Amino acid sequence: MIGVLGGTFDPIHFGHLRPALEVFQSIGLTELRFVPLNVAVHRRQPRATGAQRAEMVRVAVQGQTGFRVDENELARPGGSYSYDTLASLREGLGAREPVCLLLGSDAFRHFLTWHRPDAILSLAHLVVMRRP
């Protein structure tokens, strides 16, 4: 099962990493992809460039087996939507590989305002995390 955690990661911090590690270990993910977004649609734009944020994530997760940076979102023009990210991932993986979208409880409170929330649920399971 593959986990996906998107965010600005400007910067990545303990509130991202600790819950992600707990989910990774507790539900037995084989891989956890950290996806830095390109253009924020639900918050202010990041100050660091996409390349800088991807590098911050890469440094933060190095040495943790199964954690990796997915930079596909950074190459996509326009607003960064979880639906588009998951649809692209699902296309590459096929229908059989289970996918989980990890999100903080703060983000989950607004999930129904996201772009195509119903379609997101057809592409991935939701795992809601409480940040430390």
PLM region spans:
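Nucleotidyltransferase catalytic core that binds NTPs
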Residues: M1-P132
